[in-house]
Amino acid sequence: MGKLGISIYPERSTFEKDKAYLDLAHKYGYKRVFTSLLQINDDKEKVLSEFKEVVDYANSLGMEVMVDINPALFEQLEISYDDLSFFHKMGAYGVRLDIGFTGAEEAKMTRNPFGIKIEINMSSGTNYVDNIMSYSPNTDNLLGSHNFYPHRYSGLGYEHFVFCSEKFRKYNLNTMAFVNSQSAEFGPWPTQDGLCTLEDHRDLEIATQVKHLILTGLIDDISIGNAYASEEELKEMAEAFNADYPTLKVDTEEGITENERICLFDNLHSYRGDRSEYILRSTMTRVYYKDKDFPPHNTRDMHHGDVLIDNEGYGQYKGETQIALKDMKNDGRVNVVGRISDDELFLLDFLK
């Protein structure tokens, strides 16, 4: 089972606010905590003390803190990749390498005596992970995570995301991607238009982003990149992540009948394996409600994303629930009862 995560940035907030956010995330089952230690511009001891205070509190809740770091900071802190005791003393669950070494160092780091996880960047599209694997790392301690992208239009395209993710899936490594809170206001840098991995996610509701990542089958863990997400977002994300089946938002037509509402919302839908190019068919509603009335109404022509129920004019198909995949003419035997919400239409391509 994958894990949900949040991000906190102690240098840009207060311990009291971070603590309250950790409590809220813990309430909804969040396990991972991402934080960034890419540069230290102020007093080193003060910054590290603030980080440790947050890490200690997260650990007290049973959460796992991943510290984002780059090779330059190893030099600034006078620590070495072959001695991770600094991060062990900090209480970190793992270290994420924002910029990697040569491959040999990463492999050696996975064999540290503290069991600290080493998380590497998944988004570069190079043979980086293949190189690390050639040095026989301890794969129990080797994880992958995508970047997030504060600059609008700089996030990953879907094809590149798949290409990169499959490199890690090939080795059965744990994978993580970031989603974007619409209510959060900051990240590790002053300028940010949200902090998501996929550019197409930037303006979507958080639950929709999560549904998409799950449906790709490529991502284990999902973290919110920016802070602080609202309680409603934390709740909706957890519900989407933990759902036994994917759900789609439906905007119903005015005037749908109670029987049609029952067909739509009181049933678990699955589509037939002999999939049509024109419709997704959930056939069991016609069996369950064969004795119910489905009179003709709203029999306009059908468009991609429309939700349909066959009316009594379709004989034995009466009560069958469908989703239109293409535009189609309506001969009066199909009721258009709703429509997949525009922002989730793209999810139809990912249903399996």
Language model features with spans:
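N-terminal active-site wall of soluble small-molecule enzyme domains
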Residues: 47-93, 104-105
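C-terminal functional modules
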Residues: 251-352
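Glycine-rich, proline-tolerant flexible connector loops at the mouths of alpha/beta enzymes
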Residues: 31-54
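Active-site mouth loops of central-metabolism enzymes
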Residues: 2-19, 67-79, 192-204
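Catalytic domains of carbohydrate-active enzymes, especially glycoside hydrolases
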Residues: 17-39, 87-94
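Catalytic beta/alpha-barrel core
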Residues: 36-38, 44, 68-71, 91-103, ...
